[in-house]
């Protein structure tokens, strides 16, 4: 975790794509977290923020990894003992993730996808609108050039860069 005194009443999670510079590849493939797709090389940052939009923790994955695959690991990195609600977008709609969140004695606020048979009666739509805090955190992170475009060959080096940018966001408090 990046900070111990966070407001953990609500936790918001999301992921964003980061373009990788053409010279950032070439290291050991297991230590890179860069994938190739039609859009080019990319890495994905999965971020958890507190009720004020301050970064709590993050995980890097290759750019083609689906959000719901990384979500249980991201949720495990956050201390949810004092958290009432964990909020995420439709990309995290999974019964396995909902069960994982319930095991932590936290309520989920994740809308169901359109093709699901369950309803969205459980949703707190006013709280869901506050989810923009995690999007704003990504915007703040991407203000740093080294985060917005990945230049590092190794995953560990880029992780350190993102952690430093998260620390700068906390310092502004």
What are these regions (language model features)?
Residues 1-113, 126, 165-166:
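Polybasic low-complexity intrinsically disordered regions
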Residues 7, 28, 122, 145-148:
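A generic, residue-level signal for flexible/boundary positions that often mark functional hotspots
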Residues 99-100, 104-106, 124-173:
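Basic, amphipathic alpha-helical segments enriched in Lys/Arg and hydrophobic/aromatic residues
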Residues 115-116, 156:
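Positions that flank functional sites
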Residues 117-123:
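Short, charged, surface-exposed secondary-structure boundary motifs
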């Amino acid at each position: 975790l990046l900070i111990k005194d966070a407001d953990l009443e609500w936790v918001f999670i999301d992921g964003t794509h980061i373009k990788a510079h053409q010279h950032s590849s070439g290291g050991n493939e297991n230590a890179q977290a860069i994938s190739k797709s039609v859009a080019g090389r990319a890495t994905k940052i999965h971020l958890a923020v507190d009720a004020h939009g301050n970064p709590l923790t993050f995980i890097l994955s290759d750019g083609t990894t689906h959000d719901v695959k990384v979500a249980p690991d991201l949720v495990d990195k956050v201390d949810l003992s004092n958290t009432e609600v964990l909020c995420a977008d439709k990309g995290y709609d999974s019964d396995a993730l909902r069960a994982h969140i319930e095991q932590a004695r936290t309520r989920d606020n994740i809308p169901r996808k359109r093709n699901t048979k369950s309803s969205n009666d459980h949703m707190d739509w006013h709280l869901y609108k506050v989810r923009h805090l995690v999007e704003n955190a990504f915007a703040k992170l991407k203000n740093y050039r080294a985060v917005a475009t990945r230049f590092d060959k190794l995953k560990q080096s880029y992780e350190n860069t993102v952690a430093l940018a998260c620390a700068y966001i906390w310092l502004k408090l």
